[in-house]
Amino acid sequence: MDTAATPASDAVPTDTIGADAVRALIDHAILKPELSRTDVDAQLDEAAAYRVFSVCVRPGDVLHAVERLRGTGVGVGTVIGFPHGTTSTAAKVAESLQALADGAFELDMVQDIGAAKSGDWERVQRDVRAVVDAADDTVVKVILETAYMTDDEVVAASRAAVAGGAAFVKTSTGFAGGGATAEHIRLMRETVGPDTGVKASGGVRGLDTLLEMVQAGATRIGTSASARILDEVAHRSSTGAASAVGDDTSSY
């Protein structure tokens, strides 16, 4: 499985997007703290059935997810320092090493949000670099939590993430009261250039929103509404019309 960031110039054309292209964009999020093992298994099975690129699970679920998805072609990623980014760098490194030992193939780390809000970009960069170094060749995505950031901070945080070696910058955890916006995706894409991935997460609950994010420069999508989105692709492909189904406001 190719885990490299997709250059912006190779972003999926939104006027011709098909099911396979949508699948290749999706990290199916299974991150809510209240999910039982039965709930997690149902989501893992859904991800396998819809053949999405990967799942992003809670750290304690990595080993189980790897076993359950073995042979499906669906990768298993996880989150580090989630959702607040306030754990120490040493704790993030330890969490990363455990996740890798359990079989995670990508890591979505939360930046040190407090350091970012303090303008301590050297500290943010060091935090990212420590996880990137621990991850070795594993893809690391840095969650900025854009709901808390000014535009200037989004730019500075994106630069710090890239300087720290991140393969992707990512908008949101989905737990901060605000998710991805096209405006933030454009700003992040303009900042990091064509060779770093940009992941839109939080609030991407339908195909139209996914297409808007891709058009703005996203090369990966984090969502728990994968089934709804891919069902919408199939519906439009077969009928040429948008579905009447409303947005699922309960999704990540």
Which stretches of residues belong to each language-model region?
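Short hydrophobic "strand-cap" motifs at the C-terminus of beta-strands
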Residues: S201
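Short, charged, intrinsically disordered terminal tails
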Residues: T239-A242, G246-D247
